[in-house]
Amino acid sequence: MINPLAQATSHTVAAMTNVAPRTVLMITPGYPGEMPLFTRGLSVQGATVLGVSNGPEHELPELARRHLSGYLQLPELFTNPAAAIPQLQRWLGTRTLDRVCCLWEPGVELASLIREALGVPGQSYEQALRFRDKDLMKQALAAGGVRVPHHAVARTATEVREAAEQVGYPLIIKPIAGAGSQDTFRCDDAHEVDKAIAQLGHIAVVDVEEFIDGEEFTYDTICARGRIEYFHIGYYRPRPLIARTNEWISPQTLSYRLVDDPWVAEGRAMGEQVIKVLGYDTGFTHMEWYRKADGEVVFGEIAARPPGARTVDLMNFASDVDLFAGWAEAELFGTFSLHIERKYHAACITKRAHGQGRIQRIEGLDRIKARLGDAICAIDLLPLGSPRRDWKSTLLSDGYVTLRHP
């Protein structure tokens, strides 16, 4: 098996020596699981990395702690930014920030508020909203000529039903500022709309949109000063909405090597258009799009962050690079010096245990190791005795196996 950090060491971008040192505020440097790797990326590029989150420092993963030069716990960081940001300013004192980074969806707007309060360059609050509010997002893209699903915004049960009549069936109901496929429902008639409404009482605003029947892909980028420096095409098998509603499925995310294939050409072109229309400047983006049976390509949604569920690891395995450090170079210096050679298809297969309770045995793993050998990049399964996770509330379920092949 391949150690993603060791594998990428010789490809890690050298820290820039001809520019002044950078000081970066990293929001949630230890969570989700990939964040310590992004924190490390900033550090190896020569930045002084300061961390802030709502949890105590001792709970941070060791990798994150090792690459931080300071950490502030702000319990109200996400619940009351108006109170938390002045506390952050007092803690910083005379220190000046060059960048504010957050690669976790719930913190994208927060990061923009901190930038504006402290006068730090980067994505503004208005720009961030176009990546968080699906209505604003689709309005901007439709005006720019991008094919988006027909949709309507709803805040009450009555508005949801009215929107359903306007959009037509089948349709999707999902949070206006959600992430992934959580709290997302397909409805084929008014009765199913009522069932969805009963489960969405904790969501203030929803998007009711046309259901696009097709295969689902991603278009992910690292941008620097408005330039797309790196892009990635991913493929979900099956589409997440199906995987989220069928427990027996082992969901797969495929990193597709043949980025010039006609199968994905229109989606790639759409992705480039979306970045241009939204005026994205610097950082990671994660876009989802659909290809219908008749070949039509339809936009899904886009986020100003990397994909989750270890997909950046997939990108690294596919090209033997370190995109955690590559992203950091773009963020800090506006450059991207990694050489990208698309060597492999790579896939992450998520596993769900059978039954309830604790993991009692793992079947078939030895056969997989014997059969696939060097094609296995990583195996991360819950150890025996561990309680099974709630498969509906986690993307990685009870663990995963990552493979690659030319």
Task: Give the positions of each predicted feature.
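Peripheral (often C-terminal) accessory segments that flank ATP-dependent C-N-forming ligase machineries
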Residues: M1-Q7, H11, L25, V49, ...
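Short, well-ordered beta-strand elements within core beta-sheets of diverse protein domains
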Residues: F185, E210, S255-Y256, N316, ...
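ATP-binding N-terminal substructure of ATP-dependent carboxylate-amine bond-forming enzymes
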Residues: M1-E126, T158, F336, L384-P387, ...
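ATP-dependent carboxylate/phosphate-activation module, predominantly the ATP-grasp catalytic core
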Residues: H191, E210-Y280, F284, R291, ...
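Short, flexible turn/loop "capping" segments at secondary-structure junctions
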Residues: L63-R65, P175-A177, E247, W391-S397
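Flexible, glycine/charged-enriched surface loops at secondary-structure junctions
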Residues: D281-M287, S337-R342
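Active-site nucleotide/adenylate-binding loops and adjacent lid/helix of ATP-dependent enzymes
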Residues: D133-G214, A224-R227, T253-A269, Q273
